[in-house]
Amino acid sequence: MAKIADPRDIILAPVVSEKSYGLMEQNTYAFFVAPTANKTEIKIAIEQIFGVKVDSVNTANRAGKRKRSRTGYGVRKATKRAYVTLREGSDAIDIFGGNAA
C-alpha cells in the first residue's frame, strides 16, 4: 500500500445531520474530507483511524452558498463529503458517543 498523508488531515469531521444518522443504521457513515482527497486515500484513512474494513466510498462536492450581509455578498466555503460503507460483519464506528437515532 502506498504511504499517505496523516489520516487526520484527510478526514476532517463527521457530518452531523438527520441524513447521516439515518445512514448509520445501514452501516454507512458521512464525513467532511479534504477537498483534494481521493476515494483511495479516504478509504485508507478511515481504516487507519477507526480500525474497520471499508466496503465502498462515495464522495460529493458541495459548492459554497452565496450569502448576503449588510455590507454586500460573501460565499460560504465549498465542502467535500465522503459517504463510507463498512463491510458486513465489521464493527460499528462510534463517532457521536451514543446510540444512533
From Swiss-Prot:
InterPro entries, per the entry: Nucleotide-bd_a/b_plait_sf, Ribosomal_uL23-like, Ribosomal_uL23/eL15/eS24_sf
One cellular component (GO) term of this entry: ribonucleoprotein complex
Keyword RNA-binding: yes
Domain of life where this protein originates: Bacteria
MF-aspect GO terms: rRNA binding; structural constituent of ribosome
Subunit structure: Part of the 50S ribosomal subunit. Contacts protein L29, and trigger factor when it is bound to the ribosome.
Protein name: Large ribosomal subunit protein uL23
Annotated source species: Corynebacterium diphtheriae (strain ATCC 700971 / NCTC 13129 / Biotype gravis)
Gene that produces this protein: rplW
